[in-house]
Regions:
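Alpha/beta-hydrolase-fold serine-hydrolase catalytic core, especially in secreted/extracellular enzymes
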Residues: 95-98, 103-165
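Active-site-adjacent alpha-helix of alpha/beta-hydrolase-fold enzymes
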Residues: 45-124
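A short linear-motif detector with a strong N-terminal bias
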Residues: 5, 30-33, 66-71, 140
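Sequence-level motif detector for i,i+2 pairs with an aromatic at +2
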Residues: 21-22, 85-88, 157-159
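Structured segments of extracytoplasmic/periplasmic soluble domains
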Residues: 3-6, 27, 50, 82, ...
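Primarily recognizes the serine-hydrolase "nucleophile elbow" in alpha/beta-hydrolase
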Residues: 1-47
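Intrinsically disordered, low-complexity boundary segments flanking structured domains
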Residues: 11-14, 72-81, 148-151
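Active-site-proximal helix/loop capping residues that flank conserved catalytic or ligand/cofactor
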Residues: 22, 88-91, 128, 132
Length: 165
């Protein structure tokens, strides 16, 4: 999804963002090979349309992976700020792991990765934030955009983090 939104992969030529995408919501976003040329700022320079990254403080990659929870924040950190007000958002749910963003874990996943089978404690906030994002940026709803930056933080747990630019 990030490639369609305008990310340039390390070591690959730049490709324009897909014009059909008006906004991107990325569950567990990432930046593979963060130290590779051309650098993260150039790699994410074309992420100009609205973008929301949803991740967790324990959202490491599955198995042997170069993705850490901190890496999940890099697309937001290196994307340009919105021109006419905030249009880039990062929501980090405390304790959230990778499978929390895939829905309810199956019995096999639960036994392999020791994850809970019930929905994540932050599920309602994830749904509210993502719905407001779509309403704000696809529906051009100024009230939803205002709620996202002013009211959403009051609904989050004290250990969750929400940023926008």
């Amino acid at each position: 999804m990030q490639l369609l939104a305008g990310e340039r992969r390390a070591g690959h030529p730049a490709t324009p963002p897909d014009p059909r995408l008006r906004a991107t919501l990325a569950l567990s976003p990432s930046a593979r090979q963060p130290d590779a040329p051309p650098g993260l700022t150039q790699r994410f320079a074309h992420l100009r349309r609205p973008f929301m990254g949803l991740t967790g403080s324990r959202d490491d990659g599955m198995g042997l992976s170069d993705i850490t929870a901190a890496n999940r924040e890099l697309p937001y950190r290196h994307a340009p700020a919105g021109i006419d007000g905030p249009n880039k958002y990062l929501l980090v749910f405390a304790g959230g792991n990778h499978l929390d963003f895939a829905g309810q874990a199956s019995e096999a996943e639960g036994s392999l990765f020791a994850v809970r089978r019930e929905p994540a404690v932050f599920r309602d906030n994830l749904l509210a934030a993502s719905t407001a994002f779509w309403q704000a940026h696809l529906g051009l709803d100024a009230g939803a955009r205002r709620w996202l930056v002013t009211d959403l933080p009051g609904h989050l747990r004290p250990t969750d983090r929400f940023e926008f630019k």
